[in-house]
């Protein structure tokens, strides 16, 4: 549910807190689509960003993070640090969520559902990127290597997964949100001062997301509202397991975040264009790599 928090940073009220990165995808029919990284499923590691003309800048930020310096990534896409990010298609950098949120349903009737990863845009319509390559790869069987969806360039389906639930008079819904300071402490810069500034900045963003009023709309037919008879409880849980009550208002969180952002220095907002040639090369390289492994196995 933390993914529902991230889009609040598109709100004008929080414009000073984060840079905005938008990617333009040109279509074969002459039109263009603009994708905000805040809306991309894999954030700054999403295929629409990784195969844009910001690719080198993103690669460098991940390489720096791999070496233990997350400042470059925070300048580029701080919400990728707050809500977690996995650069699975290149550097392998995996950053845990600092803010996570779950909604648990107790004493309910379980259902199943089919799920899908939807690519940030329809890459088959991208100028200079032929639909045939994507269609051929997606038409392959489950065992076929180098599918376009593996690179985030096409949709991916998953059937019969655990899904929705039906509630009755004995059911209960519990929303739990966690802001992990231990995950925050894993972030560092190239000096003690840079580390302190980085952590304060990311903590500020996390607190803003953590305390912001949430839209009651969960999905069609499901509106979630607090139970006035069971007010929310806030606790600080220390390493030794002791707990103390804690409260913070959204206004206080925002004031802290603004001060921390000014001290850290928010990165510049950027615009970029999807690069179909880079995406085609990545598809070809992935297919060649898999074919080589397959040939090696057959030769044994």
Put a short name on every predicted segment.
Residues 2-300:
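Basic polyanion-binding and macromolecular-assembly surfaces
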């Amino acid at each position: 549910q933390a993914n529902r928090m991230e889009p609040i940073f598109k709100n004008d009220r929080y414009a000073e807190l984060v840079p905005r990165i938008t990617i333009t995808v040109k279509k074969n029919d002459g039109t263009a689509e603009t994708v905000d990284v805040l809306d991309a499923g894999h954030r700054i590691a999403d295929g629409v960003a990784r195969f844009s003309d910001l690719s080198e800048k993103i690669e460098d930020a991940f390489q720096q993070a791999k070496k233990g310096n997350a400042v470059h990534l925070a300048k580029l896409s701080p919400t990728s640090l707050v809500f977690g990010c996995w650069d699975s298609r290149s550097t392998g950098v995996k950053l845990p969520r600092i803010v996570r949120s779950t909604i648990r349903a107790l004493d309910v009737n379980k259902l199943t559902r089919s799920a899908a990863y939807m690519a940030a845009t329809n890459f088959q319509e991208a100028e200079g990127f032929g639909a045939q390559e994507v269609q051929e790869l997606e038409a392959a069987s489950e065992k076929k290597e180098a599918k376009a969806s593996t690179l985030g360039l096409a949709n991916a389906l998953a059937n019969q997964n655990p899904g929705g639930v039906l509630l009755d008079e004995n059911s209960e819904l519990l929303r739990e949100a966690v802001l992990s300071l231990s995950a925050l402490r894993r972030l560092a810069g190239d000096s003690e001062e840079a580390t302190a500034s980085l952590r304060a900045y990311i903590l500020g963003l996390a607190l803003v997301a953590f305390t912001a009023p949430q839209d009651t709309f969960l999905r069609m037919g499901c509106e979630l509202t607090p139970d006035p008879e069971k007010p929310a409880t806030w606790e600080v849980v220390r390493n030794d397991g002791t707990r103390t009550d804690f409260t913070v208002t959204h206004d206080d969180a925002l004031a802290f975040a603004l001060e921390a952002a000014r001290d850290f220095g928010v990165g510049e907002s950027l615009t970029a264009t999807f690069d179909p040639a880079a995406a085609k090369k990545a598809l070809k390289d992935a297919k060649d790599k898999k074919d080589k492994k397959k040939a090696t196995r057959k030769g044994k």
